[in-house]
Amino acid sequence: MMTEEHTDLEARIIKDIHCKEIDLVNRDPKNINEDIVKVDFEDVIAEPEGTYSFDGVWRVSYTTFTVSKYWCYRLLSTLLGVPLALLWGFLFACISFCHIWAVVPCIKSYLIEIQCISHIYSLCIRTFCNPLFAALGQVCSNIKVVLRREG
């Protein structure tokens, strides 16, 4: 019994990320399309007070808009969903590849080189600027400012 539980736990831990279960109810769990794509009839068509169409026309227009948007989206997603998913998967794979194999190594290389330069810069500052400003500080240390009120 204990061995079965351990094997089941290992199976869950080793589970491939490409086989994770997807939520078919909440298809936007991170709400990335909350304000952008959510367009209803009331967001597009509105009749101001005093210029109303017949109630039947309004109902049929609402139904036509809603049903046509629903089925047009379904048709487009059926025809283009998989090819576009393939395209976007390829694009983000290329971006990830470039980031992992080009951008990060370039940044690390730059940081290594700039660290060497920063040591040389720091040495120059300590060698030339620190004594200069210390001397200027000594020269200016005897300056006294006196404020008087006239009145």
Swiss-Prot record:
Highest taxon, organism lineage: Eukaryota
Record membrane topology: Peripheral membrane protein
Cystine pairings recorded for this chain: none
Keywords on record: Cell membrane, Golgi apparatus, Isopeptide bond, Membrane, Ubl conjugation
Transmembrane spans: none
Tissues with expression: Expressed predominantly in muscle.
Family the UniProt entry places it in: Belongs to the caveolin family.
Official protein name in the record: Caveolin-3
Organism: Rattus norvegicus (Rat)
Lineage, opening ranks: Eukaryota, Metazoa, Chordata, Craniata, Vertebrata
Gene (UniProt): Cav3
